[in-house]
């Protein structure tokens, strides 16, 4: 019996050390060496202060800023430790009610905007933490942001255009605008005036 237990325990200890220590440390070390920004969470630092991550959406409630997609991480919006979709099916009345409330809130924030509300401004992403919106969603909000900041709409739309990222490799995904990067650029342009 000892002939069976001893090799099993040695193999268990060896594989535990290999897969539980050596492999994670090697992968983490390689990631930090090859991709230092991404390995640290793609943090955005401004003036020595971390202001967010380019990978995690944030709650911008100020109407002078662009708003991202709704968060599905209730009851704490944009909580990265609670990432996950809302799990509401397309026929669920709760989803229809939530979308209706979000449309009403967008209309109340910009009563003069009669354009159709882009779907990504009223529905959460699969993770509930999407940092990006479509260019259509950004342009939908541009008039409100320009009016509240006293900026020409052309300047705000140009800022949106300059922050629009093409699909990955030209075909994977859709064009997108990172809300944090756009709002930081907007704040920087306002501070430069």
Curated annotation (Swiss-Prot):
GO cellular component term, pick one: plasma membrane
Keywords for this protein:
ATP-binding, Cell inner membrane, Cell membrane, Ion transport, Membrane, Nucleotide-binding, Potassium, Potassium transport, Transmembrane, Transmembrane helix, Transport
What is the protein name for this chain?
Potassium-transporting ATPase KdpC subunit
**What is the scientific name of the source organism?**
Variovorax paradoxus (strain S110)
Instruction: Report the transmembrane regions from the record.
Output: 7-27
Subcellular location as annotated: Cell inner membrane
Subunit structure as annotated in this protein's UniProt entry: The system is composed of three essential subunits: KdpA, KdpB and KdpC.
Q: Which family does it belong to?
A: Belongs to the KdpC family.
Mode of membrane association: Single-pass membrane protein
Q: Which Pfam families match?
A: KdpC
């Amino acid at each position: 019996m000892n002939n069976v237990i001893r090799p099993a325990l040695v193999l268990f200890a060896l594989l535990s050390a290999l897969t539980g220590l050596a492999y994670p440390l090697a992968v983490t070390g390689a990631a930090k060496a090859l991709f230092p920004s991404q390995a640290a969470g793609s943090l955005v630092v401004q003036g020595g202060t971390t202001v967010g991550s380019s990978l995690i959406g944030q709650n911008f409630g100020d109407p002078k800023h662009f708003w991202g997609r709704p968060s599905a991480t209730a009851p704490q919006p944009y909580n990265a430790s609670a990432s996950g979709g809302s799990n509401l099916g397309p026929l669920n009345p709760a989803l229809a009610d939530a979308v209706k409330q979000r449309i009403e809130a967008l209309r109340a924030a910009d009563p003069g905007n009669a354009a159709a509300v882009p779907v990504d401004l009223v529905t959460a992403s699969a993770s509930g933490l999407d940092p990006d919106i479509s260019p259509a969603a950004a342009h939908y909000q541009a008039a409100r942001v320009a009016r509240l900041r006293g900026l020409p709409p052309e300047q705000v739309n140009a800022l949106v255009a300059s922050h629009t990222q093409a699909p990955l490799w030209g075909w994977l995904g859709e064009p997108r605008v990172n809300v944090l990067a756009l709002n930081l650029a907007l704040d920087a342009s306002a501070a430069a005036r």
